[in-house]
Amino acid sequence: EDYYLGLYSTRWLPVERQPWGSVERSLDAPLGMASMPTVMMWDDHDIFDGWGSYSVEMQRSPLFQRLFFHARRAFWVFQMQHAAEMLPELKLRTDISVRSDDPLFESIEWSKALKADKLGLPLLDKQPGFTFTHSLGPLQLVVADLRTERSHEQVLGPHTWGAVHQYLNAIAQNDRKHPGVGCQHLLFMSSVPVVHPKLSLAEAFMDSFGSEHVLDSSADDLKDHWTNDSHEGERRRLIETLLKTAQQKQLRVSFVSGDVHVAAWGTAYKADVGTKDNWAHIQQFTSTAVVHPSLVSVTERLFFHVLNTVARSRQSLDISLHAEMMLFPGSNKYVMAARNWLALEFDLGTDNPSGSKLWATWRCETKDAFTNHLLATDPVHRVD
């Protein structure tokens, strides 16, 4: 545990930084976090590279489980900003009489666990992970925990699926007003992109030659993707669930993701509806860690070329359900190998009777400057 707590301490508040209030400020992570609100969710690197994508035997080993235990506590204290003693224990379900290779935990009543904390995060009840939501005017934000219950075959466990369904059903119908009570745009925060180029040949290569190595980041990165064959069914379930919500509540859904060291834009859509039914199009906005240099080595550049080539192919998830990478706004490529960040902004106060647009703006680093890349997501078209 000292390792995880010490790592957070040195990264979040280095001893060599200038004191607060100094004339010469330290332009570092502490200043950034002190200046900007954050919504945090863990991914594999908050535990160790590829957590959840190894074999059942490795995932259940005492060493892996102990590392997960301490990483969970450190994440709870630093990123979720809660006292360590308030973290409920994860307990495996005992009501299952058959063997399961997936981690199936008892659900947690988070509202009770955090009742004494007035600043407690709005974690969804009846799920063992940290999935939580925020309501921001006409925007609803779902921050999904994709690590607590992850395995080779599973991303979200049954209790979490139930909690997400209950939350989506309770979203207020879009009244197309601001201020108002309805939701116009739903952002689903997924640490890894839901819509991304599918690297089938690379997956087959890894499966053929073996990839069960704790330090082999290329292998576990492929297994982590929603596009991996083992997660394709659950990816389709997620997209269909959100499309159903979009239709019922008359709102737009967008995915916001990172982790893949590139900037990209994709879409998942139903092909059996009219062009005016724009609720049937989910946008995928992909950015990356703002301090991470993007694909700089020769091997990474070759991988970037492969990504752009594979991205041209449309992915068929079902007869009338497809996923597709789009040419990056203002570019002739599908993915941008550049350090970047993404801003999302509402067009509030406009006279559009359908509601507010959601603007996505990527700022991409070049050798000497930055480039802007804008994309607008229209509100759901009004049907009179």
Regions found by a protein language model. Name each.
Residues 1-384:
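Metal-dependent phosphoester/phosphodiester hydrolase catalytic core
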